[in-house]
Amino acid sequence: MESENAEAENVVTGNLEAKSKEGKNMQFVTLSSAWSLQALSSLLNPEEEDGFDFEQGQCSFTIGAMGPGNIGPPKAKESKAIPEPRSDESENIWNPEEVPEGAEHDDIWDVREIPDYEIVFQQTVGTEDVYLGLTRKDPSTACCQELVVKIKLPNTNPSEIQIDIQEMLLDLRTPRKKLLVNFPQPVERNSARASYIWEAETLEVRMTVQRDLDFNIS
């Protein structure tokens, strides 16, 4: 019995020694691979050779992290540029240029009614235009001299009408009515003429259109 136990112990001891040798051999192979990668990296980057720690503890710590990506110079970290705010940016929720002209005159709390209105272009046509064709006039709005705004104001006293005319805007107020009109073309504000037609209960405002074309005979 004692001889059998001794033989069993010898077998177990032999197996442990064999496994220990295999583990040492694997560790040696792994360490050799790590040393080879570090040596190759040192050849490619001689100026960084002093920065490497070849001690066994340091080597064993970096074994798992070594790979083909460690060969060559270290990758520089990409720095993301933070865009600086433009000097023209402000805390406004919209650009002042995007606000339509006349919006500052509008009041959402004003409950006055908006009257009906229409915009009409008019032009003066003479015999030289109809029969002789001596000018370059045509029926388009570009050839019209006047812009007429007709506003329905029933039961309104003309003395109660307040009107303000800008180059691209008409602002009309009465005790019961309110109207803001944006013109399709700029007008000469000093040329405005207003008249109230009692039969039609309509206010007509005539203004001269600012024209780029000149239809006078040269």
Swiss-Prot record:
Ranges for region Disordered: 66-103
Keywords, sorted A to Z: Cytoplasm, Golgi apparatus
Main localization category: cytoplasm
Matching InterPro entries: DNAAF6, PIH1D1/2/3_CS-like
Localisation per UniProt entry: Cytoplasm; Golgi apparatus, trans-Golgi network
One of the record's GO cellular component terms: cytoplasm
Keyword Cell membrane attached: no
Disruption phenotype: Deficient mice develop normally but manifest male sterility. Sperm are immotile and fragile with the axoneme of the flagellum lacking outer dynein arms (ODAs) and inner dynein arms (IDAs) and showing a disturbed microtubules organization.
Basic and acidic residues composition-biased segments: 75-89
Lineage: superkingdom: Eukaryota
Subunit structure: Interacts with HSPA1A/B, HSP90AA1 and DNAI2. Interacts with DNAAF2 and DNAAF4.
Described purpose of this protein according to its UniProt entry: Plays a role in cytoplasmic pre-assembly of axonemal dynein.
Similarity comment text for this entry: Belongs to the PIH1 family.
Record's protein name: Dynein axonemal assembly factor 6
Species this chain originates from: Mus musculus (Mouse)
